[in-house]
Amino acid sequence: YRVNVKSLVWYSPDNFEDNGYEIPETMEDLLALADQMVSDGNTPFCIGLGSGGATGWPATDWMEDIMLRTHSPMTYDQWVSNDMKFNDQRVIDAMEFFGSIALNDSYVNGGTKAVATTDFRDSPNGLFTSPAECMMHRQASFIPAFFPEGSEAGVDYDFFYFPPFEAQDLGKPVLGAGTLMAPTNDRKITTEFMKFLLHTEANERFMEKGGFLTPHKYVDIDKYSSETFKGCLLYTSDAADDTTG
C-alpha cells in the first residue's frame, strides 16, 4: 500500500547555498563535506534514535545502507537470513563506520549522548532552526510529515541520495520499505476499507498531503504534493538492479 525510500539525506537548500556547500556524489565526498562543516563551525548531522519501545530502529537503516554500500547484495541477503552472523567482521566494520559518525561529538547535534534520547520525529527539527543546529539528516521519505508546519518542499528542504563509496563498485543501491495490510476479522466494513485502499483515490489523497509514496501504477503522479516527492518516487524505479528492500 505504501513504500518508503530510505537512502535519502535531507537538507536545507538555503543553508547549503549560504555556506557554499555542494551535494556530495560519493561517500568520500560526504565525509569531506562533514569535516568542512565542522571546520566552519557547523554541525553536520541530526541523528535521533528514540522511538519508545522501538528505540534504535533508525540505526538499523543506517546499518543496512552501509552494508549495501560496502558489500554485494548477495552478502546483504546472507546477513538478513542470518547465514552470516551479526558478529561477522563485515557487519562489525559497518557498525564501526556508523559509529564514526554517530559517536563523533563534532558530527552530531547535541553530541553523542543525544543520539539515543532524541525522538526520531523531532530529530530533523535542527535543519529548520536559525541558526541551523545541523546541516543534514539521513532518513526515509516519510520524514517530511514531521517537519515544521508550513515547510515547503524544494524551498525549505530537499534531499539527495545517500551516496556510494567511490572505492567500491556496487552501483547505486537503494534501501526501501513497504507497508502491508492484513485483516484481523472478516467484517464487511473491514473488507470494504481494504478495497478502498486499493483505489487510486485513496492513494492520491495521501499523496497530496506529502510524506507518502505509493507503488500504485495507476495514480496521477501530478497529485504528489511537490516535485520533491516525485523525485523520491523515481529512486524506486531508477535504482540499480541490485537494489534491496
Regions of interest found by a model, annotated:
Residues 15-16, 34-40, 119-137:
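Short helices/loops that flank or line small-molecule/ion binding pockets
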Residues 27-29, 112-126:
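Short helix-initiation/N-cap motifs at beta->coil->alpha
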Residues 19-22, 102-119, 133, 152-156:
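A local structural motif
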Residues 34-36, 80-116, 162:
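Glycine-centered hinge/linker elements that transmit conformational signals in sensory
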Residues 18-19, 142, 148-214:
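Extracytoplasmic/periplasmic substrate-recognition and gating elements
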Residues 1-23, 28-31, 42, 48-79, ...:
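Periplasmic solute-binding protein
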Residues 235-243:
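Conserved small/polar residues in nucleotide/adenosyl-binding loops
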Residues 68-93, 149-151, 164-173:
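Short, solvent-exposed loop/beta-turn-alpha elements that line the ligand-binding surface or hinge
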